[in-house]
Amino acid sequence: METLKGSAAAGPIRTAVVGFGISGKVFHAPLIAADANYSLDVIVTADPDRASEAARLYPDARIVPTPEDLFALSGDLDLVVLGTPPLTHFDLAATAIAHGLPVVVDKPFVTTSDQGQELISRAADAGVQLTVFQNRRWDADFLTLRKLVGEAVLGEVRSFESRFEWWRPEGFGNWRDTAAVSEGGGILNDLGAHLIDQAIQLFGPVTESYGETANHSPDPGGADTEAFVSLLHESGVRSRLWMNGMAAQVGPRFHVLGSESGYTKWGLDGQEPALAAGTTPTDPGYGVEPQTDWGTFGIDGDLRPTASEPGAYPLFYAQLAAALRGKGPLPVDPEESLDVLRVIENIRAFA
């Protein structure tokens, strides 16, 4: 793969963020703006209110209404970040690649595995770097569990339970609620892209998958609002994953049982709400969980709190900068996101 040349090889990586909804505003723009490896040069949004807010928050960025305006500036850019609905990912990423621009695609990667394979092939042919924003690999709780698994203190892991549940019956009011499954909508596409990815990162490739989906929204023809997934890994571990945006009571975030011990964690990672509230990644205490939120490790009768590793979303962009300069691997191999998409497709084929 080609690496950055000229001023970007040493100076800031000139970056454009496409979309300024939850993804662009809460995640990408703050993370990029806080990293000295980057300059946030362009933000694309057609929404007047979002454009005004983007201009207020990032006065040095150029705000343009359309991707066409962005790609007209491609000679002045080094990276494109897509924080748009999944139905747009393929065309926008393909256009960025055609302009020779490295691209970050938010999850879900694309709407079909065929599209994903095509993008990977086009990027390889063009010598352009392509990655996917699987930011939940840098959640505090996931980093903690990954450390415990790596240290083998649980013994042989036999069962892994993972939940992303909350009570939000009104929905998000965006593509997550309104897009059809074929357009990347539904909770399995949205959160399954995270939870399945985490399970594979922990326990390896999947040999069997099964799932159930349900729609509890007022629209009987709408996409799923609840999903359950069961995975059998080559390692022998069984993962069971729950996703529910209408859960009046939530279960533990993680419940992991091994031959020697177990680990249980409640509550969701705090980085997203912190970023949404205006905290920046450079603020003291960013990503640090209070002791009251720590998980417990041990066996019944001998349980003890286990300090959470700091949440670290900024590492995605730090690792990406190194990769773009030829100094390390991409933070997320798009082939791994493609594997997740194939699992989701298999589940949907039989759910």
Model-identified regions with their sequence ranges:
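Hydrophobic residues in well-ordered beta-strands that form the structural core
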Residues: 24, 65, 105, 111, ...
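C-terminal glycine/acidic-rich active-site capping loop/insertion
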Residues: 35, 255-335
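Beta-loop-alpha module in the N-terminal Rossmann-like domain of NAD(P)-dependent dehydrogenases
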Residues: 58-122, 312
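N-terminal Rossmann-like dinucleotide-binding module
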Residues: 1-58
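C-terminal helix-rich "cap/oligomerization" subdomain common to oxidoreductases
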Residues: 1-12, 69, 79-81, 304-306, ...
